[in-house]
Swiss-Prot record:
The keyword Mitochondrion applies. It comes from the Eukaryota. It comes from Mus musculus. GO terms for molecular function: amyloid-beta binding; protein folding chaperone; unfolded protein binding. PANTHER family: PREFOLDIN SUBUNIT 2 (PTHR13303). Residues 9-18 have a biased composition (Gly residues). It is found in: Nucleus; Cytoplasm; Mitochondrion. This is Prefoldin subunit 2. Its main location: nucleus. Residues 1-20, 126-154 are annotated as: Disordered. GO terms for biological process: negative regulation of amyloid fibril formation; positive regulation of cytoskeleton organization; protein folding. Heterohexamer of two PFD-alpha type and four PFD-beta type subunits. Component of the PAQosome complex which is responsible for the biogenesis of several protein complexes and which consists of R2TP complex members RUVBL1, RUVBL2, RPAP3 and PIH1D1, URI complex members PFDN2, PFDN6, PDRG1, UXT and URI1 as well as ASDURF, POLR2E and DNAAF10/WDR92. Interacts with URI1; the interaction is phosphorylation-dependent and occurs in a growth-dependent manner. One of its GO terms (cellular component) is prefoldin complex. Keywords: Chaperone, Cytoplasm, Mitochondrion, Nucleus.
Length: 154
């Protein structure tokens, strides 16, 4: 893998390069993944609200005369149209928003799995998280010793 400077991560030939990831790097990677997940969730919530607004407008416009004037914002400009012209465009937009929300949901699930795998790989525990289940699983032999070497993230 290449880091942000474009260099491939390898040690100076000592063979200890694989386990040389510092706790700060692990925390930075974990926080980056969490931020990406929050961004996806935020965008999905924003689109859900927009979808609800579209549904509300569509339901309202279905009840009025098709020749009635209505106004629509197009590229920052308010344009006068008729209900007959606007309704199909709104329904098309609503379908596109639904597709985008589905895609974001899939990406959010994938990011959640990636985050959990990262946590397990680097033994990351969040502050306030219950440590009793982890102690039960690792109570055999050297497993208890390995669990104390994890990274604690606030």
């Amino acid at each position: 893998m290449a880091d942000s400077s474009g260099r491939v991560g390898k040690s100076g030939g000592s063979g200890a390069g694989k386990g040389a990831v510092s706790a700060e790097q692990v925390i930075a990677g974990f926080n980056r993944l969490r931020q990406e997940q929050r961004g996806l969730a935020s965008k999905a919530a924003e689109l859900e609200m927009e979808l609800n607004e579209h549904s509300l407008v569509i339901d309202t416009l279905k009840e009025v005369d098709e020749t009635r004037k209505c106004y629509r914002m197009v590229g920052g400009v308010l344009v006068e149209r008729t209900v007959k012209e606007v309704l199909p465009a709104l329904e098309g937009n609503k379908e596109q928003i639904q597709k985008i929300i589905e895609t974001l949901s899939q990406q959010l699930q994938a990011k959640g799995k990636e985050l959990n795998e990262f946590r397990e790989k680097h033994n990351i525990r969040l502050m306030g998280e219950d440590e009793k289940p982890a102690a039960k699983e690792n109570s055999e032999g050297a497993g208890a010793k390995a669990s104390s070497a994890g990274v604690l993230v606030s």
